[in-house]
Design a protein with these regions (language model features):
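A residue-level marker of the well-folded mature domains of exported/periplasmic proteins
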Residues: 1-272
Length: 272
C-alpha cells in the first residue's frame, strides 16, 4: 500500500473527525477547510470570500430599482454573517436607500428549501436575489421570475443566463498547488491560511448584463482591495441597533471578523 501524505478535509462539519484521524496518522498532513482546530500535522484554510461578496453588493445596489434586495442565507455563523455584511456594505455604498432582507434556511444544501426562501423574498418585492447556498436554486427561482440573481461559490450563469449578474467564486486549485509544493519541498508547517483576492483563492465573475460603467467601478474596487488600498469593512459601520461598530477609517481585526455576530444597519433580519 502507498502511504497517503496529504488529506484535504473540505467541510466545516468534518472538523472534530479530522482532529481525531490526524492523531492516529501523525505522518500524514491534514488540511481542514473553514475550521479552527489545529495540530502539528493539521492546518486550516479558508478564503476571504467577503471581499468578492462586497463587490457583488456594489452590483446589486446599482441594479436594484425597488431598493429591496433578497438574500437566501445558510447558517447564523460568523462566516456567513461576515459575507452578508460585506455584501450589504457594498450595496449601501452604491445605493444608500436599499435594504437587504435575509431569510435563513439553516442548511448548506436543500434546493427545495432554498427555492422556497427565494420565492418568499420575491413575493416581498425583491428585484435582486443573492445567496450563500451551495445550490443554484435561488438563482433559478429568480430567473423564472425575470429577476436579477447573484450566485455563490461558482459561476452560476448557466442556471439563469438571462438574469445572472455576478458571483463570488473560489479557486481552490491555487491553494492546493501551494500546499502540495510546500510539502514536496519539506516547507509545510501547520498554520491557519486565510487568503483573499490578492492570492487568487477567491474572486468575482460578472456577466455581460452588468453595465460597462458599473463593471469598471467593480474592477477598480477589486484593484484597490488587491493593493490594500481599501478594506470592505472600513468604517464608519453602524449596526442594526444604531451602535457605531467602527468609526471612519477604522477596520476590524481578523479576530473580530472571525467572531462577527452582528448585522449592519441596512439589513432586515436577525443574525441571532
Amino acid at each position: 500500500e502507498r502511504e497517503v501524505k496529504l488529506v484535504f478535509s473540505t467541510s466545516f462539519g468534518f472538523m472534530d473527525d479530522v482532529v481525531e484521524v490526524a492523531k492516529n496518522f501523525p505522518g500524514t498532513v491534514f488540511m481542514h477547510c473553514s475550521g479552527y482546530k489545529t495540530a502539528e500535522n493539521l492546518g486550516t484554510y479558508f478564503g476571504r470570500i467577503y471581499e468578492p461578496a462586497y463587490l457583488t453588493g456594489l452590483i446589486a445596489g446599482e441594479m436594484t430599482k425597488s431598493d429591496l434586495i433578497g438574500y437566501v442565507a445558510t447558517f447564523k455563523i460568523p462566516e456567513v454573517i461576515r459575507g452578508i455584511n460585506a455584501f450589504a456594505i457594498g450595496v449601501s455604498k452604491a445605493n444608500p436607500n436599499a435594504q437587504i432582507h435575509v431569510i435563513w434556511t439553516e442548511t448548506w444544501f436543500d434546493p427545495s428549501l432554498e427555492e422556497e426562501a427565494a420565492e418568499a423574498l420575491l413575493d416581498l418585492g425583491a428585484d435582486v436575489i443573492a445567496q450563500s447556498q451551495d445550490s443554484p436554486a435561488a438563482v433559478q427561482a429568480a430567473g423564472q421570475r425575470g429577476v436579477y440573481a447573484i450566485g455563490y461559490n461558482t459561476d452560476m450563469s448557466a442556471f439563469s443566463p438571462d438574469t445572472f449578474l455576478s458571483s463570488p467564486v473560489w479557486n481552490w486549485g491555487i491553494f492546493y498547488e501551494r500546499v502540495i509544493n510546500e510539502l514536496m519541498d519539506d516547507k509545510w508547517i501547520s498554520n491557519q491560511y486565510w487568503g483573499g483576492i490578492s492570492d487568487g483563492v477567491v474572486d468575482i465573475v460578472m456577466s455581460d448584463l452588468v453595465p460597462e460603467a458599473l463593471m469598471d467601478l467593480v474592477k477598480n474596487e477589486r484593484k484597490r482591495i488587491i493593493e490594500s488600498d481599501h478594506h470592505p469593512f472600513e468604517g464608519p459601520l453602524i449596526d442594526q441597533e444604531g451602535n457605531t461598530r467602527y468609526s471612519k477609517g477604522e477596520t476590524p481585526t481578523d479576530e473580530e471578523l472571525l467572531a462577527m455576530d452582528w448585522f449592519v444597519n441596512n439589513i432586515v433580519g436577525s443574525p441571532k
